[in-house]
């Protein structure tokens, strides 16, 4: 007779272990689980632990050839979500041996691979991950980080200013370069390729890189400030992407860009390593994130994607604005902004942070606020994001009635006025509009911008909200 009992057994017998004490080296995950009717939460939580680690649907004889106790994921706690019917937070601990060192790709393949198609669950969302220091240390992380970036750019004590060049598609390379030059000479620190600008028939990448480099060196010479343009190196293959990054380095520009979710984590980590080795900053766009993170009960929360990016590598990442046209509730946004910038972040459920995270000196990432923001938002943005951030005004620069350069001037004046007021001890949350109005008196460009955008509001409730306490 065979030495094991065939047949199907309940997951919870093996994978639900409420008495388990988590180890410092475990990767911990918090899943929001919605079981199918009739499936008990312990079975659902155990099923998640099993399917994302060593389990399969039946007992197999090869189980006897290894030590499941050493390698299995364990569901060690389950809590009911207040105010939601049939939703639970299942906490799962994974032994570190299950993951390849330095590979975000492998980590996600395990933790959020097959398990999301699992029939016993109606829906499943990964809310947070605790990455243990032992695993963090196998990653290079951001190519440079916040302090090195400030030193490279020689810009201190204020947020950085950016602008996405619009119309995003259709401009020729020369006209695109003109738009870049006007924005940079007006006072912005950066301009940006839109995420879907790669290498299209109307503007091939090499032409764009050349004209943008010319624009930024010209603006640099005129203003005496270091300028940058995020040259989007995203391409159809890793080799092509690196070829574009090499060309950017040869031109002597300071920064390139990547769409990390559509490009993929393997490509992103490859580019991040190249950028560190060659002194390029790396701006990260999160195109496609809402496909993954927008549903409250299914998918992956953006704070997990943000943590993954810090491990994979990037110096800037888009993180919502709290005040503009794109998703972002204040407490939640600030929660993952801290996870991007700080070295040590305490568990804080009021901000959606399920685990204490120690980054053990991995460089930080600058959050980028972008999307539907304009000069009237400047006090709120300065207040919410603080100095270590990039504020990006696309339409809020190029939509200025007098053109790009005056639009850039308006934004720079508004920013400098807000920073000055804050440093003098004024409360931007209360006096913000007053600060902007005062600045209008000596900046006609700002006054014109304030007139254009005084009525614009994007009034929609955020989809991503915290559970009732």
Curated annotation (Swiss-Prot):
Reactions catalysed according to its record? 2 (2R)-3-phosphoglycerate + 2 H(+) = D-ribulose 1,5-bisphosphate + CO2 + H2O; D-ribulose 1,5-bisphosphate + O2 = 2-phosphoglycolate + (2R)-3-phosphoglycerate + 2 H(+)
User: Which major enzyme category is it?
Assistant: lyase
Please list the residues that bind Mg(2+). Answer: 192, 194-195
* Predominant localisation class: plastid
Q: Name one Pfam family in it.
A: RuBisCO_large
Query: What PROSITE patterns is this protein classified in?
Result: RUBISCO_LARGE
Reproduce the UniProt comment on modification after translation: The disulfide bond which can form in the large chain dimeric partners within the hexadecamer appears to be associated with oxidative stress and protein turnover.
- Cite the EC number: 4.1.1.39
Q: Which InterPro entries match?
A: RuBisCO, RuBisCo_large_chain_AS, RuBisCO_lsu_C, RuBisCO_lsu_C_sf, RuBisCO_lsu_fd_N, RuBisCO_lsu_N_sf, RuBisCO_lsuI
Sites where N6,N6,N6-trimethyllysine occurs are at 5
Is Plastid one of the keywords UniProt gives this record? yes
Cofactor: bound how, per the entry note?
Answer: Binds 1 Mg(2+) ion per subunit.
Taxonomically, the superkingdom here is Eukaryota
Q: Which GO terms describe its cellular component?
A: chloroplast
Question: Where does this protein hold substrate?
Answer: 114, 164, 168, 286, 318, 370
Cofactor(s) listed in the protein's UniProt record: Mg(2+)
Q: How does it assemble?
A: Heterohexadecamer of 8 large chains and 8 small chains; disulfide-linked. The disulfide link is formed within the large subunit homodimers.
What is the protein name for this chain?
A: Ribulose bisphosphate carboxylase large chain
GN (gene name): rbcL
């Amino acid at each position: 007779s065979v030495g094991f009992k065939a047949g199907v057994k309940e997951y919870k017998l093996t994978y639900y272990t409420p008495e388990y004490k988590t180890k410092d080296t475990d990767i911990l995950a918090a899943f929001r689980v919605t079981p199918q009717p009739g499936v008990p939460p312990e079975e659902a939580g155990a099923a998640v632990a099993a399917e994302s680690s060593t389990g399969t649907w039946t007992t197999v004889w090869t189980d006897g050839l290894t030590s499941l106790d050493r390698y299995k994921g364990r569901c060690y706690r389950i809590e009911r979500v207040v105010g939601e019917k049939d939703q639970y937070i299942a906490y799962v601990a994974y032994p570190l041996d299950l993951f390849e060192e330095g590979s975000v790709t492998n980590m996600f393949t395990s933790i959020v691979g097959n398990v999301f198609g699992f029939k016993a669950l109606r829906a499943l969302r990964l809310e947070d991950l605790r990455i243990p220091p032992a695993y963090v240390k196998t990653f290079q992380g951001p190519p440079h980080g916040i302090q090195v970036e400030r030193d490279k750019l020689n810009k201190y004590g204020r947020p950085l200013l950016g602008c996405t060049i619009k119309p995003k598609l259709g401009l020729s390379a020369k006209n695109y370069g003109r738009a870049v030059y006007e924005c940079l000479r007006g006072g912005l620190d950066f301009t940006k390729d839109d995420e879907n600008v790669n290498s299209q028939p109307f503007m091939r990448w090499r032409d764009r890189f050349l004209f943008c480099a010319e624009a930024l060196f010209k603006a640099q010479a005129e203003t005496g400030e270091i300028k940058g343009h995020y040259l989007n190196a995203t391409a159809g293959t890793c080799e092509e992407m690196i070829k574009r990054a090499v060309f950017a380095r040869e031109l002597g520009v300071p920064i390139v860009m990547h769409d990390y979710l559509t490009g993929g984590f393997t490509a992103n980590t490859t580019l991040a390593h190249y950028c560190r080795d060659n002194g390029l900053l790396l701006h990260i766009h999160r195109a496609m994130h809402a496909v993954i993170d927008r549903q409250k009960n299914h998918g992956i929360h953006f704070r997990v994607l943000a943590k993954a990016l810090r491990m994979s590598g990037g110096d800037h990442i888009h993180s919502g604005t709290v005040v503009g046209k794109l998703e972002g509730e204040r407490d939640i946004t600030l929660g993952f902004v801290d996870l991007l910038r700080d070295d040590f972040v305490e568990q804080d459920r009021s901000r959606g942070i399920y685990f204490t995270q120690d980054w053990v000196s991995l460089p930080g990432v600058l959050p980028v606020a972008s999307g539907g923001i304009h000069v009237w938002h400047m006090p709120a943005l300065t207040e919410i994001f603080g100095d270590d951030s990039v504020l990006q005004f696309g339409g809020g620069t190029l939509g200025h009635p007098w053109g790009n350069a005056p639009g850039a001037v308006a934004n720079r004046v508004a920013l400098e006025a807000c920073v000055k007021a804050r440093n003098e001890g004024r409360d931007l949350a209360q006096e913000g509009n007053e600060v902007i109005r005062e600045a209008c008196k000596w900046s006609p460009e700002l006054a014109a911008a304030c007139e254009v955008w005084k009525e614009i509001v994007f009034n929609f409730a955020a989809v991503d909200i915290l559970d009732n306490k």
